[in-house]
């Protein structure tokens, strides 16, 4: 870069002191730029560390914003609750009472100061009057003391007026303080009445919700009991039909097996009666018939084993179902005993006898009807009690709201 600057140079003139002259000098400045530097590649540790720091900062900022939002939301809802209950009005009234008390105490202090000043002035005036009484009227100090007494009387009058104004201000501030206290007490009483009324309303609503919930729970239990009874009614019938079908098929297979064995015996006896001449020519046919019969016999035996295993499984299921039905019958018996405590103890053997006589379905149906009637009766009683409670509480609520 080339630039031009004006400098001062020394020039020696022959026999003359050196003088400063201005010369124009050209300065040349060369700027060397470095070659393009290649960016340094970051190591994976540095990249991971930077990412960790960024994520930490982001998490901290996010947590701070979430805390601020949660605190603002909680404060908003708390302010709404205080406004709804009336705590804001009570707090404002208490603040007014505090301010009125401070003003009253200031006025009281002013009254005290004015009274002290007035008493001090009266004391001084008394001293001056005593001196006037002791000095003769022809004395030179008498005029000075009379003038001082006059000034002190004027000052006493001013202090007395100040004291009276301070007392009036004190009475006014005391009346304002009393009004603020009464207002605070009224606001507190109103808040207490409102809280009591809302508590009563909440109790009534809670009772109604409890009755509705108990009714719903009883209905759901009744439906579950109905489903259980229906399953208990359908289970033995379907299982007996399946056992009957399997038994019939087993008997048919046994009869077919006996017929097959008889045919096989007849064929064996017929084969032994033939001569040795026809034995060589008919041996392939006889072997083939024997193989067919053996295969049929093996198939029949395997089918019989399968049928027997199925029958055993059905018998186990029947035993389990009988246990379940006996348990259900015991539960029904307990419910019946709870509904009718005057029944005899001999009815404890009712489920077993009903199961043996095949009349359990009728007993279950009867028990279902009784339980349904009892649940309906309890629901009706609960509804009547709720209605009566609401009718009894409604005039009380009306009187409370009217009074408040």
From Swiss-Prot:
Task: Extract one GO cellular component term from the record.
Answer: mitochondrial ATP-gated potassium channel complex
The record's subcellular locations are: Mitochondrion inner membrane
Is Mitochondrion there in the keyword field? yes
Keywords of the record, alphabetical order, are: Coiled coil, Ion channel, Ion transport, Membrane, Mitochondrion, Mitochondrion inner membrane, Phosphoprotein, Potassium, Potassium channel, Potassium transport, Transit peptide, Transmembrane, Transmembrane helix, Transport
Provide Mitochondrial matrix-side residue ranges.
Answer: 31-196, 402-404
An individual GO BP term: potassium ion transmembrane transport
- Which parts of the chain are coiled coil? 111-138
Transit peptide located at 1-30
This enzyme catalyses: K(+)(in) = K(+)(out)
- Which residue positions does Phosphoserine occur at? 65
| Entries under InterPro entries matching the protein | CCDC51
User: Which residues are on the Mitochondrial intermembrane side of the membrane?
Assistant: 218-380
Q: Where are the transmembrane segments?
A: 197-217, 381-401
Activity regulation statement = Channel activity inhibited by ATP via ABCB8/MITOSUR subunit.
Task: Identify its membrane topology class.
Answer: Multi-pass membrane protein
Q: What does the record give under GO molecular function?
A: mitochondrial ATP-gated potassium channel activity
Self-association state and partner proteins as the record states: The mitochondrial potassium channel (mitoK(ATP)) forms a heteromultimer.
The record's annotation in PANTHER family points to: COILED-COIL DOMAIN-CONTAINING PROTEIN 51 (PTHR28624), MITOCHONDRIAL POTASSIUM CHANNEL (PTHR28624:SF1)
Role this protein plays: Pore-forming subunit of the mitochondrial ATP-gated potassium channel (mitoK(ATP)). Together with ATP-binding subunit ABCB8/MITOSUR of the mitoK(ATP) channel, mediates ATP-dependent K(+) currents across the mitochondrial inner membrane. An increase in ATP intracellular levels closes the channel, inhibiting K(+) transport, whereas a decrease in ATP levels enhances K(+) uptake in the mitochondrial matrix. May contribute to the homeostatic control of cellular metabolism under stress conditions by regulating the mitochondrial matrix volume.
Under which name does UniProt file this protein? Mitochondrial potassium channel
The protein's organism comes out as Bos taurus (Bovine)
